[in-house]
Amino acid sequence: LPKGDFPTVSYPNPEAPEAFALGLKLAKEKNADLVLATDPDAVRPGVYVKDAKSGEYIPLTGNMSGSLLCEYVLSQKQASGKIPADGQVVKSIVSTNLIDAVAKAYGVELIEVLTGFKWIGKQILKNETTGKGTYLFGMEESYGCLIGTYARDKDAISATAALCEAAAYYKQKGMTLWD
């Protein structure tokens, strides 16, 4: 049965390396490509990726995982011809400028909002209210992201699923998420 006090970790935070101790141990035993964790309310994903060259597991920062997911989501939309002319990527003002480059590469508008995911949610609402702009992806440096508009807050469940999908996609191409 699940335990609400999370007895397997001292601090259930996907930004904290100690939250991955058991997962990393098992990943090494099984030769896994990824180790994923979320915070208790499943809004922030954490990920370690295996470096195929060294065999080491490397943690991705929120900026790194957000950038990787943004690029993957947009690449898949582009491949299927589903990037709308008014497509948008939304990020908090303290998030990496790599997102700017990804958005530009796919020809979508970059919207910068204040720190806090509620501002990303408000951009989605603004788009829906005005009928202008199509939200595609949003992220903040503190490990939060949202793919699509089904929610107004960050969602680690869809993010971890997308990370697994991206890992499988790149593995078929002979690459890891670290590559």
Go through the PLM ranges and name each one.
Residues 1-178:
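Phosphate-binding chemistry for phosphorylated carbohydrates and sugar-nucleotides
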